[in-house]
Amino acid sequence: MRYPLGEALLALYRWRGPLINAGVGGHGYTYLLGAEANRFVFANADAFSWSQTFESLVPVDGPTALIVSDGADHRRRRSVVAPGLRHHHVQRYVATMVSNIDTVIDGWQPGQRLDIYQELRSAVRRSTAESLFGQRLAVHSDFLGEQLQPLLDLTRRPPQVMRLQQRVNSPGWRRAMAARKRIDDLIDAQIADARTAPRPDDHMLTTLISGCSEEGTTLSDNEIRDSIVSLITAGYETTSGALAWAIYALLTVPGTWESAASEVARVLGGRVPAADDLSALTYLNGVVHETLRLYSPGVISARRVLRDLWFDGHRIRAGRLLIFSAYVTHRLPEIWPEPTEFRPLRWDPNAADYRKPAPHEFIPFSGGLHRCIGAVMATTEMTVILARLVARAMLQLPAQRTHRIRAANFAALRPWPGLTVEIRKSAPAQ
């Protein structure tokens, strides 16, 4: 599966090299492509503004979310949010992840056709809400999905279109703002309740309420609310898309589903996966990483340049929008042999040709000071869900498909208009 925008950037890189300027002066674009370009971007984090780059995400994530935070505000907020998403915390959520995907699989019947992408969106949204914030938000998972959708629809349009919608107060803008108000009211009430009557399963909510930054300050209720919304939104929007692509690959690359199912059966012996089992699922981990390589959620990413920079003898003027690309980096043959082939075994440390990529060579979660704080959560959830799928079900793509599957949405790559599969077998949960 190839994405036209990504392919155009890849062709541009091969033709012009790592730096391409478009537009005039400080108001144009600079394309900085390839692994060394990524290293440069991550090493110069203080030269870019996230708030100016991602202002179009404010209606969804809120004005204090990490993705629109710069400098001291970003460091302070991240120092409170990040500890709750470290590996040892995420391991405690594996049982919740298993329970949520099992509930979805329990509803499947042999011969049934369904959009696996939509099924996974619902499962991941509830799993993320329950894992991080307990039942107090998990019970509202469907409501949150309904209210977030008009906001996500805004972000799938160019920023210029969103600004126009805001300026003219279009019906779509009004629907989105009304939805955000309903989300805010719900989460504000849950924050207030958690302060007065905390629960054992509040998990991340407890971290956000009681955590202190390195300077000893706590988050405001607005910052807590924006953190909750952005964690749920980013978690299910990107992870469900990546999972759909993983299933697409497993169903279209000969032998991959069988290899994954065989490994899960051998390692788990019919048990549900526990946190300690995941590292032993070498092939399945390869499926996850290979999916994130070929189908990175973000085809491109951008940074607004705050001060003049020099890269490889070329000046990058302040004010320009710098664009770099995981899609390009992940398809360079000098880094990835046979780059367009889906090869889970390239991630096996025991393979003769194994090569661990450098941080600037594999960037599905970006890198540097602004690397996605949910990376461990996402890869863990993908591994758990795929392990249950190959253990309990057999899927296939319909022999007669009514539409061609395409890649859509450069910010959270997803199959469009969905991924219809047929259930061949669905076994009861062990």
Curated annotation (Swiss-Prot):
Key words, A-Z: Heme, Iron, Metal-binding, Monooxygenase, Oxidoreductase
Keyword S-adenosyl-L-methionine: no
SUPFAM superfamilies found in the cross-reference section: Cytochrome P450
Pfam families listed in its UniProt record: p450
Co-factor requirement: heme
Binding site for heme: 372
Family of the protein in this entry: Belongs to the cytochrome P450 family.
Protein name per its UniProtKB record: Putative cytochrome P450 139
A cellular component term, taken from the record's GO annotations: peptidoglycan-based cell wall
GO molecular function: heme binding; iron ion binding; monooxygenase activity; oxidoreductase activity; oxidoreductase activity, acting on paired donors, with incorporation or reduction of molecular oxygen
